């Protein structure tokens, strides 16, 4: 089967936004106008196509990225293939956003015209910045009371530190929002009728003429800056043609020099088609973005894979989902080469072979079997046994490991136990399945109490995990109180000289290590060897590192993992017969236990960045309450008629905050919270924690 659409006609993009900015509604409209949906699904009544998990429909928030393929005919009459990844907007699911951004070529950032740039928008924007994803901005909900397009544009600069390139101006606002002024064609587009299938083109309203000319001038000035020849021509008074202008805007967007801004209201079906045209005009195809880099497994050198069907096959697994009909589905982005059903693949991260069973093209919750897929495609593979999120699948003859994704450490833990004996075995299976799907969710056993502990990114994250166990796996479980994931570190330098000797008949054990333990600024563990003259033979040094790493998971104060430790092996001794890697491992373990105590161990707690948006009447109460939670207020600012309170608060003091904020503000204030950094625990609190965990 030959390729149906040229790779240049592909657009792999996602829609990213704060919770409630209208993302699901926007995706629904896109699917409706591109012909995939026969009826528009409204989030308000829980009938949306993309939000296909039952819980998402209940909560009205999008949890898992659903991938959808659809088609759009651009202004030039050529059909384009859109692969849309829907991303969640709630802060507990930033991991999902990170995963989808990793495999996208472009994105649309949705803003609520009333609220402008909200906290979660900033978080997602920063993640997109990390992967240099070209972005456009769509100011949505222009029909909402308090909608302010110009303030939203200003916030793109002040809050996100990004250059906004305004392509449209709104005609009217709130209930009077009629349409937009297209600043490239310099014409007005107005939508009528309930489903806004087509816009009428007309003159720019006289009251907007001057403003449109001013913004058109700004647009041209910013666009010509991306190209030297265009800048020179412009300075000599030669204006770019509309075609040249579109090409310049495309170049600037793809190179992430600026971000085109459009506006409308997805709910009222105004402004969606021009946005789809803009996706075609300005967002990159797979060949417009830099080739993905990775490591050549054979040479261990860096390599790149071009977006071409002729290159060796390479794809990245970015999501695993359980489908009630097909079983486990692995979503993959094909970066290079082509893939046929039934072929053998290599998982280079796990060093395992995988046999490809069914291959599916997904449309939100329906699916179609396909025989072959090409570079640029996003597909769901059934029947993979070993592959987890972030793994590379490729041609076994040309093995490569594509860049790994980084996943944050969970900050909150709860104990969980099955309600009945029958649930016991099912719970283990369910938790392992869910952990394979979501790298920010961890399961472990507490060795002393024998309890099962689950850890995640926030209370909502773990609520949803427990809920999914009940719904999808029919497992009823009792859940304990949330616990904080504390850490331990050291505060000063300690030098330990430790000798491990065991002489009890037969082969003995001998190893001497002299190690300097010291704190360092990062969170990771650094090991260095300064052995000269063979005091510790080279083959035993990995044993020293392994020994220390094996006990880093349990600190001396309360058994929490250690952070920010540097260990330097400076001297040692060995015995020709009795020394072994194991002996050095044991010696290093004991040296670390001594060293951690002598190096002034301290407890660390996760500090959360909290942002509360509240009506002015409750600001005093909100600040007083955050202070009582050991919070440090970093500032307040006005946002429209509301006030934003920013604070750093220990996670230990934030449990149940949603209920107290609700009662304090009569349900009118909202908050978002995300992990920021670890900080030493005050000594009085540390003693309590040590007693509790001792």
Curated annotation (Swiss-Prot):
GTP binds at residues 17-24, 86-90, 140-143. GO terms for cellular component: cytoplasm. Keywords: Cytoplasm, Elongation factor, GTP-binding, Nucleotide-binding, Protein biosynthesis. One of its GO terms (molecular function) is GTPase activity. Residues 8-287 form the tr-type G domain. GO terms for biological process: ribosome disassembly. Pfam families: EFG_C (PF00679), EFG_III (PF14492), EFG_IV (PF03764), GTP_EFTU (PF00009), GTP_EFTU_D2 (PF03144). InterPro entries: EFG_II, EFG_III, EFG_III/V, EFG_IV, EFG_V, EFG_V-like, EFTu-like_2, G_TR_CS. Catalyzes the GTP-dependent ribosomal translocation step during translation elongation. During this step, the ribosome changes from the pre-translocational (PRE) to the post-translocational (POST) state as the newly formed A-site-bound peptidyl-tRNA and P-site-bound deacylated tRNA move to the P and E sites, respectively. Catalyzes the coordinated movement of the two tRNA molecules, the mRNA and conformational changes in the ribosome. This is Elongation factor G. It comes from Bartonella henselae (strain ATCC 49882 / DSM 28221 / CCUG 30454 / Houston 1).
């Amino acid at each position: 089967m030959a390729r149906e659409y040229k790779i240049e006609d592909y657009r792999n993009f996602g829609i990213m936004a704060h919770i409630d900015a209208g993302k699901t509604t926007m995706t629904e409209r896109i699917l409706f106008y591109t012909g995939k949906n026969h009826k528009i699904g409204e989030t308000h009544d829980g009938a949306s196509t993309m939000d296909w998990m039952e819980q998402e429909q209940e909560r009205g928030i999008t949890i898992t990225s659903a991938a959808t393929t659809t088609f759009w005919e651009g202004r030039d009459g050529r059909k384009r293939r859109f692969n849309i990844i829907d991303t969640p907007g709630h802060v507990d699911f930033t991991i999902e956003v990170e995963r989808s951004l990793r495999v996208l070529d472009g994105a649309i950032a949705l803003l609520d015209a009333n609220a402008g740039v909200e906290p979660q928008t900033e978080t997602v924007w920063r993640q997109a910045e990390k992967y240099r994803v070209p972005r456009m901005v769509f100011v949505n909900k222009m029909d909402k009371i308090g909608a302010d397009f110009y303030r939203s544009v200003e916030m793109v600069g002040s809050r996100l530190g990004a250059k906004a390139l305004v392509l449209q101006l709104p005609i009217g606002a709130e209930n009077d929002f009629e349409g937009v002024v297209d600043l490239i064609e310099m014409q007005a587009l107005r939508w009528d009728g309930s489903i806004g299938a087509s816009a009428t083109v007309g003159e720019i309203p006289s009251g907007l003429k001057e403003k449109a000319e001013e913004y058109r001038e700004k647009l041209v000035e910013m666009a010509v800056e991306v190209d030297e020849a265009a800048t020179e021509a412009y300075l000599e008074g030669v204006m770019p043609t509309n075609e040249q202008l579109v090409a310049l805007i495309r170049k600037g967007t793809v190179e992430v020099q600026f971000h085109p801004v459009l506006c409308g209201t997805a709910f009222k079906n105004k402004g969606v088609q021009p946005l789809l045209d803009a996706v075609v005009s300005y967002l990159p195809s797979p060949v417009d973005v830099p080739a993905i880099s990775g490591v050549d497994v054979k040479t261990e050198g860096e390599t790149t894979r071009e977006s071409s069907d002729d290159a060796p096959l390479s794809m990245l697994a970015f999501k695993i989902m359980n489908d009630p009909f097909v079983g486990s589905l692995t979503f993959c982005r094909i970066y290079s080469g082509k893939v046929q059903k039934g072929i053998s693949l290599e998982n280079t991260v796990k060093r395992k072979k995988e046999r490809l069973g069914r291959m599916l093209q997904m449309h939100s919750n329906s699916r179609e079997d396909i025989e072959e897929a090409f570079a640029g495609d996003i597909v769901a593979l059934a029947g993979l046994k070993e592959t987890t999120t972030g793994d590379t699948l490729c041609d076994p003859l040309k093995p490569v490991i594509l860049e790994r994704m980084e996943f944050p450490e969970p900050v909150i833990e709860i104990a969980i136990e099955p309600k009945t004996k029958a649930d016991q075995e099912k719970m283990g299976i369910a938790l392992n399945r869910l952990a394979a799907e979501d790298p920010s969710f961890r399961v472990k056993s507490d060795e002393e109490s024998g309890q099962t502990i689950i850890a995640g990114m926030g209370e909502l994250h773990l609520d949803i995990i427990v809920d999914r166990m009940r719904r999808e796996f029919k497992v009823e479980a009792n859940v304990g109180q949330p616990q904080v994931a504390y850490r331990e570190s050291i505060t000063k330098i300690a030098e330990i000289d430790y000798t491990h000797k065991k002489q009890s008949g037969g082969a003995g054990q001998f190893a001497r290590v002299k190690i300097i333990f010291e704190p360092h600024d990062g969170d990771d563990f650094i090991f260095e060897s300064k052995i000269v003259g063979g005091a510790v033979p080279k083959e035993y040094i990995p044993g020293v590192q392994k020994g220390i790493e094996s006990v880093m998971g349990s600190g001396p104060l309360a058994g929490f993992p250690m952070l920010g430790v540097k260990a330097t092996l400076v001297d040692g001794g060995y015995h020709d017969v009795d020394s072994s890697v194991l002996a050095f491992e044991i010696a290093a373990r004991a040296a670390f236990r001594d060293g951690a105590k002598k190096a002034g161990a301290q407890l660390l707690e996760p500090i959360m960045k909290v942002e509360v948006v509240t009506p002015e009447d409750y600001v005093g109460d909100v600040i007083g309450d955050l202070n009582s939670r050991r919070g440090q207020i970093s500032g307040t600012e006005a946002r429209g008629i509301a006030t934003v309170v920013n604070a750093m608060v220990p996670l230990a003091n934030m449990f149940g905050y949603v209920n107290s904020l609700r009662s304090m503000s009569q349900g009118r204030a909202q908050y978002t919270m995300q992990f920021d950094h670890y900080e030493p625990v005050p000594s009085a609190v540390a003693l309590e924690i040590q007693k509790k965990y001792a």
